[in-house]
Amino acid sequence: MISFVSGRVAAVTPDSVIVEVGGFGVQLLATPATIARARVGERARFATSLVVREDSLTLYGFADDDERTVFELLQTASGVGPRLALAMLGVHSPTALRAAVATEDVKALALVPGIGRKTAQRIILELKDRLGTPSTAAAESTSGWRDAVHAGLLNLGYTARQADEAIAAIAGELDDSAAVDTATALRLALATLKRP
């Protein structure tokens, strides 16, 4: 197993980060929040999980060990593969996922594309005792999301002006909430940029 990858960020795509390691470009599929923190040309370290299939080897990258642990635990639920687990982490932070499972919040889990009511109920049933309880200290700050979203939009090819306008458009909605999930903020910002 490859536990982590450390090196210079060579490129960023909408769904992955490419890290130069020993002359090789290693592609890591990642969540929007993880991608938003990666800056081309700078050194970075990603916790990783290698998923081996009959026809492929896929490396998934995460901001920290906790995110990787939740990713791997999510896959122990029936019907949840690596793509769906990554989508769940793209919509909710590890803390938010733990809270949703602990409080049996079917609606929160059903916000993830590919998860309906029955799948959400099954995930809650199978993971309630294994996923752990949410940590209140791990909630993201309300101001930190702005920098992460700005960096993410710049890495995706948007100008600084476009990034600032998108952040301004969603700021009123997000600053009212106690904890802002970076992935959600980035998704909302991208949605404002795609409007005609």
UniProtKB/Swiss-Prot annotation:
Residue span of region Domain II: 64-136
Region (Domain III): 141-196
GO cellular component, one term: Holliday junction helicase complex
Region (Flexible linker): 136-140
Gene3D superfamilies in the cross-refs: 5' to 3' exonuclease, C-terminal subdomain, DNA helicase RuvA subunit, C-terminal domain, Nucleic acid-binding proteins
Domain of life: Bacteria
Pfam families: HHH_5, RuvA_C, RuvA_N
InterPro entries, per database record: DNA_helicase_Holl-junc_RuvA_I, Hlx-hairpin-Hlx_DNA-bd_motif, NA-bd_OB-fold, RuvA, RuvA_2-like, RuvA_C, RuvA_C_sf
Region Domain I, residue ranges: 1-63
GO molecular function per UniProt: ATP binding; four-way junction DNA binding; four-way junction helicase activity
Subcellular location: Cytoplasm
Keywords for the protein's UniProt record, in alphabetical order: Cytoplasm, DNA damage, DNA recombination, DNA repair, DNA-binding
GO biological process, one term: DNA recombination
Subunit structure: Homotetramer. Forms an RuvA(8)-RuvB(12)-Holliday junction (HJ) complex. HJ DNA is sandwiched between 2 RuvA tetramers; dsDNA enters through RuvA and exits via RuvB. An RuvB hexamer assembles on each DNA strand where it exits the tetramer. Each RuvB hexamer is contacted by two RuvA subunits (via domain III) on 2 adjacent RuvB subunits; this complex drives branch migration. In the full resolvosome a probable DNA-RuvA(4)-RuvB(12)-RuvC(2) complex forms which resolves the HJ.
Family of this protein: Belongs to the RuvA family.
Function: The RuvA-RuvB-RuvC complex processes Holliday junction (HJ) DNA during genetic recombination and DNA repair, while the RuvA-RuvB complex plays an important role in the rescue of blocked DNA replication forks via replication fork reversal (RFR). RuvA specifically binds to HJ cruciform DNA, conferring on it an open structure. The RuvB hexamer acts as an ATP-dependent pump, pulling dsDNA into and through the RuvAB complex. HJ branch migration allows RuvC to scan DNA until it finds its consensus sequence, where it cleaves and resolves the cruciform DNA.
Domain-related comment: Has three domains with a flexible linker between the domains II and III and assumes an 'L' shape. Domain III is highly mobile and contacts RuvB.
Protein name in the entry: Holliday junction branch migration complex subunit RuvA
Species in which this protein is naturally found: Acidothermus cellulolyticus (strain ATCC 43068 / DSM 8971 / 11B)
Source species taxonomy: Bacteria, Bacillati, Actinomycetota, Actinomycetes, Acidothermales
Gene: ruvA
